[in-house]
């Protein structure tokens, strides 16, 4: 293990808060404001949601380059820059009133999300303290688990009392202040102290060993399927429960259960991390997801609560697994680029979720069955790398 990457200071709570801001502003917020946004721009709801979805595809296109920048300049610098870009994007949304301005705004927001999300925050934690990165990644995900709740409550208040443009200003200010915190208060001194003294280490995909290529490919499959399943399920839960129980209030209650149980899953990960292989906890978590999708088909309120608890714990654990497992096989000096490769299909899974949810919107049971069949992929992905030798 590289001594320069052990025991450094990690602003872990600041990184966690940055994920509340990033995911709240650039992912969760559009679920609440899409109707008002379409009216403001004079566009159809379908066109508006399509453009929002397309902004997520930007992650697929630039994730490898973001990974390169993360290795070259450090995760905190990339994160700070991404937050500033997102702030500009929401200011542009505040002023725009046409399709062209909307496209430009969402381009900036897409670039920002790629540069300021979990992928970069996890890389920063690994660069700063390789030895304790699993614990730090888990703490970061604690904050991310409550991003949707904080975002939806805040946006709901602003929308009801101050209107759509106040939301854009609030999100822009939040992103700007978070970026400014990293830029001024931390000033990157702690990160620089832990960066390698030599130039950026070579990392060429074609020059990787067969084992390294297999590991990256497996983790790409894991990331794509896990986030496709989670994002599609999360976007479809209210409609699914409403169709089964014919009661919107019950649907909202059931759909909200998984969020707190993500925290439970991540607490368990932190509790057992000292003596359990991250791949093993990931295997257990990946079994929770298909189990939850099986029992969710039973139209019983209490059974569905159990299903949502299992789903939340499963995804909560798998977020940590996906963030940490690459570090078992690759050095901190190249982790940004490794995660860049892995993040591209992961982002593709997230971007496909609105489209997939829309296809099955009239038959939610078929969607759940499809996702259930797909859920074997994360399990077998982790199973295949379980016996592979790690660098520790």
Can you say where each PLM-predicted feature lies in the sequence?
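Intracellular juxtamembrane helix-capping segments at the cytosolic ends
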Residues: 115-129, 317-330
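Hydrophobic core of transmembrane alpha-helices in multi-pass small-molecule transporters
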Residues: 100-116, 303-317
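C-terminal transmembrane helical hairpin of 12-TM major facilitator-type secondary transporters
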Residues: 277-325
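A late C-terminal transmembrane helix in Major Facilitator Superfamily
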Residues: 148, 332-364
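Helix-to-loop junctions at the C-terminal end of transmembrane segments
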Residues: 62-74, 265-277, 361
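Conserved MFS/SLC helix-loop-helix module at the cytosolic interface between two early adjacent transmembrane helices
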Residues: 61-99
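Extracytoplasmic
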Residues: 11-36, 41-45, 62-66, 152, ...
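Extracytoplasmic gate region of multi-pass secondary transporters
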Residues: 26, 30-37, 212-270
């Amino acid at each position: 293990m590289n001594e320069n990457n052990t025991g450094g200071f990690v602003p872990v709570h600041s990184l966690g808060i940055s994920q509340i801001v990033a995911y709240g502003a650039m992912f969760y917020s559009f679920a609440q404001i899409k109707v008002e946004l379409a009216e403001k721009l004079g566009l159809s709801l379908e066109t508006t949601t399509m453009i929002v979805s397309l902004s997520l595809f930007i992650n697929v296109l630039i994730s490898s380059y973001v990974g390169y920048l993360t290795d070259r300049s450090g995760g905190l610098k990339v994160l700070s820059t991404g937050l500033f870009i997102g702030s500009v994007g929401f200011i542009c949304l505040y002023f725009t009133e046409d399709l062209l301005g909307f496209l430009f705004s969402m381009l900036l927001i897409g670039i920002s999300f790629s540069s300021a999300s979990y992928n970069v925050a996890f890389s920063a934690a690994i660069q700063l303290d390789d030895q304790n990165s699993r614990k730090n990644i888990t703490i970061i995900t604690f904050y991310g688990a409550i991003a949707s709740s904080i975002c939806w409550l805040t946006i709901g208040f602003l929308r009801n009392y101050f209107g759509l443009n106040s939301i854009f200003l609030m999100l822009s200010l939040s992103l700007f202040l978070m970026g400014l915190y990293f830029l001024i208060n931390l000033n990157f001194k702690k990160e620089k102290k832990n960066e390698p003294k030599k130039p950026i280490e070579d990392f060429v995909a074609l020059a990787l060993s067969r084992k390294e290529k297999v590991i990256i490919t497996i983790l790409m499959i894991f990331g794509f399927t896990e986030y496709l399943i989670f994002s599609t399920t999360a976007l479809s839960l209210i409609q699914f429960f409403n169709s089964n129980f014919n009661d919107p209030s019950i649907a909202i209650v059931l759909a909200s259960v998984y969020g707190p149980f993500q925290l439970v899953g991540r607490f368990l990960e932190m509790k057992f991390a000292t003596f359990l292989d991250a791949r093993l906890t990931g295997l257990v978590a990946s079994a929770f997801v298909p189990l939850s999708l099986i029992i969710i088909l039973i139209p019983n309120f209490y059974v569905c609560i159990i299903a949502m608890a299992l789903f939340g714990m499963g995804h909560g654990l798998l977020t940590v697994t996906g963030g940490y497992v690459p570090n078992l096989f690759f050095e901190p000096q190249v982790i940004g680029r490794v995660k860049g490769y892995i993040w591209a299909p992961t982002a593709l899974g997230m971007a496909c979720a609105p489209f997939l949810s829309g296809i099955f919107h009239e038959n939610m049971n078929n969607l759940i069955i499809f996702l259930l069949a797909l859920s074997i992929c994360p399990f077998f992905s982790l199973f295949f790398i379980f016996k592979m030798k790690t660098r520790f």
